[in-house]
Amino acid sequence: MLDNDFKIANTLACETVDINMTCLQGKVTTTYDELCEVFGYPTMTDGDPYEKVNAQWKLEFTVPFTDDTGIEDFHNVVATIYNWKTGYIPTEEYEWHIGGFNKDAVDCVYKKLDMVEEAV
């Protein structure tokens, strides 16, 4: 569980991020363009209308923390953002699915989106 005031040191959007065994943790309503602005282009796209997922970002967030003994370390939080059974890549405002190993994935996605909004 992440602290309320956690920071994100790094965000990696890459095809090699291991998302095996992740599952739906939450959702975020935003646009395709905003996701591309924040995370870059999707790491996977598929135009086939019969596929369950047409656009997906595989993400790994590096979250630093200090443990109880004062030693600095970091968590790697894996997240995915994807559409589900739309038959196309949504470009309008859409309720995107957030996958991960736990709810930290949702926290990191929201935090990163908020960081970009605050900088504008």
Task: List the model feature ranges, each with a label.
Residues L2-V120:
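Residues within mature, well-folded domains
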